[in-house]
C-alpha cells in the first residue's frame, strides 16, 4: 500500500471529520469516496483508488 501524505491541509475538510462521519470529503480536492473506515481513525482514501493511496491526519477528528 502506498502512503501519500499531503503537505496542504484544508481545515474542516479532513477525512472522517465531524461534518462527514461516513468518510465523505466534499470540496476538499480529494474527491468524495465512501470510506467508512476513515471515521474515528483519522485516515481515508482518495478518489483515484480505494486502496491506492492513504492520506493520514493525526487531527482528522477536528
Curated annotation (Swiss-Prot):
Sequence segments annotated as region (12 X 2 AA repeats of G-[YCGS]): 12-53
Record bears the keyword Nucleus: no
Alphabetized UniProt keyword annotations: Keratin, Repeat
Tissues where this protein is expressed: Wool.
Gene Ontology terms: cellular component: cytosol; intermediate filament
InterPro entries assigned to the protein according to its UniProt record, in alphabetical order: KRTAP8-1, KRTAP_type8/19/20/21/22
Entry similarity comment: Belongs to the KRTAP type 8 family.
PANTHER family xref list: KERATIN-ASSOCIATED PROTEIN 8-1
Cited function: In the wool cortex, wool keratin intermediate filaments are embedded in an interfilamentous matrix, consisting of hair keratin-associated proteins (KRTAP), which are essential for the formation of a rigid and resistant wool shaft through their extensive disulfide bond cross-linking with abundant cysteine residues of wool keratins. The matrix proteins include the high-sulfur and high-glycine-tyrosine keratins.
Subunit architecture: Interacts with wool keratins.
Protein name per Swiss-Prot or TrEMBL: Keratin-associated protein 8-1
